[in-house]
Structure formats: structure tokens, C-alpha cells
């Protein structure tokens, strides 16, 4: 697909690679900070579930998973800004000249972006995991549970569900970018939505908030760590997965309809 290949070329730019680099460095730092707090004997209600999970097969993903909020934010910024930039920088019309099929163009861009986000996530988790394993072994802490077959299966479940979460967040970012057509507005609204509205809704309507997109997406990887660490899907994993897929489908359909009917003046 022409649009897909064209988008892949953009990932060689330092500005794009910088986002992936920040994701890796920040997540590794948070993971090591969490590891240090656990192994240094620090206590507190927030640390107790992490300390209890630490020696188990889910211990490694519990530690590196503490950087998930940052991973989501960076992935959302990368996708949203990349799509919205086509309007802000006035390049969308030129792209449509080379690829007249609007939906093929949008699909190609999103496939490339999701691939890049997935690769960035894989590198982030691998590097963070390697750092924590090396740090643990240097202190004489057993990592046998983490590297056992059951531990590896837990890692793969976490990675697979984290990919689903980031795909959902990327599609949300696509929708916001298509609606706003501005980098500043798209990134601002996307981050604001992730940080504020669903939390406010949960205060007044807790049961309903459990089905909102960001929460449902977060429940997927949250289901692979101990319940005390979470967030565990209160509606059950299967229901959360089905609703997440429905949200993703809705984002794709609305984005496609809006993009198809937009007047392109850029």
C-alpha cells in the first residue's frame, strides 16, 4: 500500500524517533525507581501490592507496568500529532494527489502508526525488563519466577493486551485529529480527555464509567497483573474486550465518515 510505505519513511526522522526514545527512557527509569523502592525496604499502602507481587511470576510485569500511563500518553501524542500535522502543515492535499483514495490514505497512515507504536512498545518493555532483571541479579535477588515458562506466558499476555490498549488509544487519537485538524487542539483535547472527563464521570456515575473507552482499554493489560495492582475489569475480561473492540470499531467508522466528507483546503 502506497500510503503505508510513504508513512514508514517518516519514521526515520529524529523528531519521530525521539518520541520512541523518550518512551523507552522514561519507562525504564520509572521501572527502576519502582524496583529500588521495593528492594530498599520502603513501605506504604501504594507499595504493598507491588511488594507482594514482586517475587511471583507476575512480578516483572508489575514493576515495568508502573510506566504504563506514560507509555499511553506518549503513544497518543505520537499518533494524534502525526495525523493532525497533515492539516496543520498543509500536506494533506499533496498526499491525496498521490493517493486519491481517502480511506486508503487514512488506513495506510494508521497501519504504519500502529506498527511503529507496537515496535516502540516492544522495545520499551524489553529494555525495561532487561534492566530490572540485571539489577535484580546484581543484588542477588532470584529472577527464576520471572523467567519461568509461566512467567514468560504472563509477560506475553501483558504485551498482547497492552498492544490492544495502545491500538484503542491510537484510534481515539485518530478520531480527535480528524475532527480537530490541528496539532495543538488534537493533542490538547486527547490528553485532556484521558486525564479528566472519565474520572469526573466516575465520581457521579461509577457503574457507567466502567464502560468508557480509556477505562476499558486500560482494563485489558490490567487484567494480566495481580488484582491488587490492577486495574482489574469489574465486568470481566471477556466483556471488557468486547466493549473495547466495539469502541475501536466506532472510532474507525466515525473517523472514516468524517474524513470522507471533509472539504480539504490544506
What positions do the PLM features span?
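Short, membrane-interfacial amphipathic segments enriched in basic
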Residues: 1-5, 146-149, 265
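N-terminal Sec/SRP start-transfer signal
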Residues: 1-16
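Helix-capping/transition residues at the boundaries of transmembrane alpha-helices
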Residues: 10, 84, 95-97, 173, ...
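Secretory targeting signals
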Residues: 16, 21-82, 106-179, 220-246
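Transmembrane helix segments
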Residues: 30-37, 183-219
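Transmembrane helix boundary and interhelical loop/hinge segments in multi-pass membrane proteins
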Residues: 79-103, 110, 266
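Alpha-helix N-cap/helix-start motif at helix boundaries, enriched for small hydrophobics
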Residues: 104-106, 259
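Junction motif at the cytosolic side of a transmembrane helix
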Residues: 242-266
